[in-house]
Amino acid sequence: MPPGKVLQPVLKMKVDELFLYWLSEASTQRMLQDCLRRIKAPGRDQPTPGDGEQPGAWPTAPLAAPRPSGLEPPGTPGPGPALPLGAASSPRNAPHVRGTRRSAGTRVVQTRKEEPLPPATSQSIPTFYFPRGRPQDSVNVDAVISKIESTFARFPHERATMDDMGLVAKACGCPLYWKGPLFYGAGGERTGSVSVHKFVAMWRKILQNCHDDAAKFVHLLMSPGCNYLVQEDFVPFLQDVVNTHPGLSFLKEASEFHSRYITTVIQRIFYAVNRSWSGRITCAELRRSSFLQNVALLEEEADINQLTEFFSYEHFYVIYCKFWELDTDHDLLIDADDLARHNDHALSTKMIDRIFSGAVTRGRKVQKEGKISYADFVWFLISEEDKKTPTSIEYWFRCMDLDGDGALSMFELEYFYEEQCRRLDSMAIEALPFQDCLCQMLDLVKPRTEGKITLQDLKRCKLANVFFDTFFNIEKYLDHEQKEQISLLRDGDSGGPELSDWEKYAAEEYDILVAEETAGEPWEDGFEAELSPVEQKLSALRSPLAQRPFFEAPSPLGAVDLYEYACGDEDLEPL
């Protein structure tokens, strides 16, 4: 048996064993004999039509009939759909004459007919599954439609352009930045405006079929025939945010950055919302996330950088600059050698190989060309700098799970730790023996099953970042070793609205990038002038990074190259 394999029972043999156990029971034998007797002589055991039953019909058993003792595995075939389980003690087993047996059988049938049938269970269970939200009786559709018609009456020819959709969104009771989805959902991109009749018909249908914000948002953006959102569906919505949000007004002078920002936000949306890794965001996933709450905050928060979960420009700038530093040939792709230079070669080569193996990337380009795109890099950088979130834990678990069996064996842990030991030796640092390291990690994670660590074990562990860094990030591993265990536990147990590891990293890196950009600009009077936040961003956009177009300028509909970040990869099955 190969090392690292865990013995598991053969399912068919176990089922056969349970079936033979059930078949050998005395009650089962009596029941089968009675069934065989019924088959051989059907006329003797069946009631006549005059007895109130159909010819050939078996007497109906009460639902509360006791089951025979003994182990019966789930799915074991029963004697028949209406055969009483207590038939083994039936008078038919005694050597009575034919007339007596028919009389006894008739009495049993009549007695059972007199017993009232229990009410259907399904009638007492209320509806609990609402894929498009729970219907609300308080919604007055006609009143909403009347308000919308009054709003359209203020526009020329009762047609609304994109600039008018803010008022329409408010009339619909939606947040301001739903105006883009509302406009495109009503077909406004084809003619440049939306008529009142077409919009009312569209919104009335949504109110009748979609009963919460998640279902409405998905319905507005999804492609025809779908009930989910893919990455391209978010482009028109985000293009409107870039065009109209006051916190992104400085981007009007650098339109080539629109598609870069949109690509980053789309990847962050799928990173946080698409928990199934399917590449498709459903109503249920959107409902469980905080994305729609952040969309509503776009109207209230003028500083886009305060919305750190999805829309922060500072976070985009950090991610993009880190990618540009690695992409030395500026072909919009980075290979394994480029990625190895991240953070001064902190990652092990074995882990880099796993990233490029397709374990955490979509699309076939990685396997064919050995390169990853900017969209893949967004996932990598966020996962690398914050290993405490559910998505990042899944990201690195997939990389470490070499055989894809859903558990990390001791062999897989040793496979990654060997390179860590070699790198420590090259730095003249004594490495901890693997057995000692393994004991520490098992005490840290406390797996429920001995001999393997599952994804759920790591999600329960508050120090998953320490676990992962121990096996493939030499710099962070040494940093953890220098900290006291009490300090690590304090960091893991800290509650409240404290910044996440990613937010801390992005804030620090952005300050460094702005300082470097400011220090590189000469001033005639010899003194450094204090730049406003807007001037800092404009200065950054004028940097050498902006001299070479990273994307083509977006079309009027905001089309953007998503680096073929397709969702059809068979390797990314939901965990």
UniProtKB/Swiss-Prot annotation:
User: What is the purpose of this protein?
Assistant: The B regulatory subunit might modulate substrate selectivity and catalytic activity, and might also direct the localization of the catalytic enzyme to a particular subcellular compartment.
Q: Which PROSITE patterns match?
A: EF_HAND_1 (PS00018), EF_HAND_2 (PS50222)
What CDD domains does this protein's entry cite?
PPP2R3B (cd21507)
Q: Where does Ca(2+) bind?
A: D401, D403, D405, E412
Subunit relationships: PP2A consists of a common heterodimeric core enzyme, composed of a 36 kDa catalytic subunit (subunit C) and a 65 kDa constant regulatory subunit (PR65 or subunit A), that associates with a variety of regulatory subunits. Proteins that associate with the core dimer include three families of regulatory subunits B (the R2/B/PR55/B55, R3/B''/PR72/PR130/PR59 and R5/B'/B56 families), the 48 kDa variable regulatory subunit, viral proteins, and cell signaling molecules. Interacts with N-terminal region of CDC6. Interacts with NOD2.
Quote one Gene Ontology molecular function term.
Answer: protein phosphatase regulator activity
Q: What else is known?
A: The gene coding for this protein is located in the pseudoautosomal region 1 (PAR1) of X and Y chromosomes.
GO biological process assignments: protein dephosphorylation; regulation of cell cycle
The record's listing under Pfam families reads:
EF-hand_13, EF-hand_7, P2R3B_EF-hand
User: Is Calcium a UniProt keyword of this protein?
Assistant: yes
Report the SUPFAM superfamilies cross-referenced here: EF-hand
InterPro entries (alphabetical)? EF-hand-dom_pair, EF-hand_13, EF_Hand_1_Ca_BS, EF_hand_dom, P2R3A_B_D_EF-hand
Q: What is this protein called?
A: Serine/threonine-protein phosphatase 2A regulatory subunit B'' subunit beta
Instruction: State the UniProt keywords alphabetically.
Output: Calcium, Metal-binding, Nucleus
> Could you name the Gene Ontology cellular component terms for this entry?
cilium; cytosol; nucleoplasm; nucleus; protein phosphatase type 2A complex
Report the domain of life of the source organism. Eukaryota
Please name the source species: Homo sapiens
Reply yes or no: does the keyword Zinc apply: no
Report the Gene3D superfamilies cross-referenced here. 1.10.238.220, 1.10.238.230, EF-hand
- Where the record annotates domain EF-hand, the positions are 388-423
Organism placement in taxonomy: Eukaryota, Metazoa, Chordata, Craniata, Vertebrata
Q: Where in the cell is it found?
A: Nucleus
